[in-house]
């Protein structure tokens, strides 16, 4: 029983180390070039990348209240910016 448990734990540890090493090699094989846009930032929809502060950015027009900018549709407010969840 103890030998089986030790064998399973050893295999799990080897698998974790192998996966970590494979991820590091993959990251090293794809170096970022200077001026190359970050893939996460390039994928962000420009219309969604706006400040989501508590105060209104749009001034009141007549009797209408201004609308607060909110993040929606799988986006959340983090550090006053809308980011994909």
Swiss-Prot record:
Residues 23-48 form a propeptide. Residues 1-22 form the signal peptide. Disulfide bonds join 52-66, 56-77, 71-82. One of its GO terms (cellular component) is extracellular region. Its main location: secreted. Expressed by the venom gland. PROSITE patterns: HWTX_2. Coiled coil: none annotated. It holds the Pfam family Toxin_20. Keywords: Disulfide bond, Neurotoxin, Postsynaptic neurotoxin, Secreted, Signal, Toxin. It comes from the Eukaryota. One of its GO terms (molecular function) is toxin activity. It is found in: Secreted. Monomer. Belongs to the neurotoxin 12 (Hwtx-2) family. 02 (Hwtx-2) subfamily. Neurotoxin active on both insects and mammals. This is U4-theraphotoxin-Hhn1a. The lineage of its organism: Eukaryota, Metazoa, Ecdysozoa, Arthropoda, Chelicerata.
